[in-house]
Amino acid sequence: MWLQTRMFLLVAVLFGILYGVITGIGTWMGAGSAISYLILAFVFLGIQYLIGPSIVTWTMRVRWVSEREAPELHRMVAELAEKANLPKPKVGISELNIPNAFAFGRTQRDGRVCVTRGIMNLLSRDELRSVLGHELSHIKHRDMAIITLLSAIPMILYWLAWSMMWGGAFGNRRQGGSYAVLIGLGAFLLYFITNLLVLYGSRIREYYADQGSVRLGCKPHHLASALYKLVYGNARFRDKGELKQVEGARAFFLNDPARAWYEVKEL
């Protein structure tokens, strides 16, 4: 119940921030400009929804594997999908050495589950199965659509900040350039804040997925030991190139590489 309340409050805060910024622009520039920004915001959201899976596939270097290539992986995914009453998602292996797993897709029928090379070399079969159960729970709860929707808000605020500060605010800069810069700086600050809020929302959805993995028959201690190994595996990972490459996909990960050292200290 508390998880649901936190998620509801988070969504309300994020959309409240977006509404406040667009209302502020409308008050200063006129309703027509605010409506233009609102339309562009929905266009951005639609584009992200359509091309998001392709971007994740490319960024994470995912290779979709057949049952012949990864029979055990496919078998575990098929069993868990049947228990969850889901269509079997596409199965992929990310050619990254950082140990992690993620799920994405627009709908339950468009679900995709991926594991990295690093996690396959780190976990036992039972631990990997519990992780896959966790990822299928994300698909079951439509978490990817929720996170995609929420992650569009920081992107919109970044574009608003850029437009106000460097784009001339659609030609009104000479009439009130200082106000445009102030609004732009405010939007830029809110961009960072909403980014953190989206990551927090992603962590809340992770708790839901942990519960879902257990409901699918995975043992809690297997999931706990898998998470323990992932935290230490990410903390020890030293390839800065790979870490930079996955920076934009942190909200999709089972374990956030950027927080691994902090989590080690908490263990």
Where are these regions (language model features)?
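Hydrophobic or amphipathic, alpha-helical segments that drive membrane association/targeting
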Residues: 1-102, 151-203, 207, 217, ...
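Juxtamembrane helix-boundary/capping and inter-helix hinge elements in multi-pass membrane proteins
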Residues: 65, 108-109, 122, 126
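Active-site-proximal gating segments in proteases and membrane effectors
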Residues: 86-110, 174-175, 214-267
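A secondary-structure boundary/capping signal
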Residues: 94, 115-119, 135
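Short alpha-helix carrying the canonical HExxH Zn2+-binding catalytic motif
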Residues: 114, 124-140, 145
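Catalytic Zn2+-binding segment of zinc metalloproteases
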Residues: 136-155, 164, 220-221
